[in-house]
Amino acid sequence: MSQIEFKDVRKVYSNGHVGLDRINLNIEKGDFAVIVGLSGSGKSTLLRSINRLHDITEGEILIDGKSMTKASGNQLLEMRRNIGMIFQNFNLVKRSSVMRNVLSGRVGYHPTWKMVLGLFPKEDKIKALEALDRVNILDKYKSRSDELSGGQQQRISIARALCQEPAIILADEPVASLDPLTTKQVMDDLKRINQELGITIIINLHFVDLAREYGTRIIGLRDGQLVFDGPVERATDEAFNEIYGRSIQDEEKLGVN
């Protein structure tokens, strides 16, 4: 049984635009899967359908054999708790401390009133500190989030996802706003988390060379259709040309080794 299964998934927006067109796809536990494609190809729609930030129109998505599509109430909350999310714009509470932002990864485990009052148990605080240590910013735990650099803020969001103790982490263009050196540091963090903790990483990336360097598997979308799915070794220039419908351009290469 695959960890994530897309079964004939279709997403049609209210304006009639087809975001996903009959996607059939299996993602295995421990994959570092990179989704690539031009802007508007369906990358974010595919990623965000996994935890139902976007609901699909037809088909079904299964997580560990359970239907995410049909889940509701407590079952949906429990399934989402197992899926961490990292955003391009970090999605932090800027005026809150680093520690408080990371602890927000624990909200799915406790009653809302306790979280509003900041009543996190000692065990959660230990998990938060361990998550910060794993991404090398433990020394910033008392700082306000808006005092930190973009790269540090993205590391906070990774630590927040880790604090959930997820089996899957979704990352939607997490390095799009970062400089090349910081990009590599963040990608190294994600790769290490994948390898050391066995957490499945599914990530949207714009840069071809990053996809090849860090991914174990490449998933290519064009106009909402799955046009490539295979190990990174098969992701040749010709394969990317097929995914993009044109040659790779210089701005699609980060150029950092």
Curated annotation (Swiss-Prot):
Designated name of the protein: Phosphonates import ATP-binding protein PhnC
Catalyzed reactions: phosphonate(out) + ATP + H2O = phosphonate(in) + ADP + phosphate + H(+)
Organism of derivation: Staphylococcus saprophyticus subsp. saprophyticus (strain ATCC 15305 / DSM 20229 / NCIMB 8711 / NCTC 7292 / S-41)
InterPro entries reported for this sequence: AAA+_ATPase, ABC_transporter-like_ATP-bd, ABC_transporter-like_CS, ABC_transpr_PhnC, MetN_ABC_transporter-like, P-loop_NTPase
Domain ABC transporter: 4-248
Enzyme Commission number(s) from the entry: 7.3.2.2
A Gene Ontology molecular function term of the record: ATP hydrolysis activity
Topology with respect to the bilayer: Peripheral membrane protein
Cross-referenced SUPFAM superfamilies: P-loop containing nucleoside triphosphate hydrolases
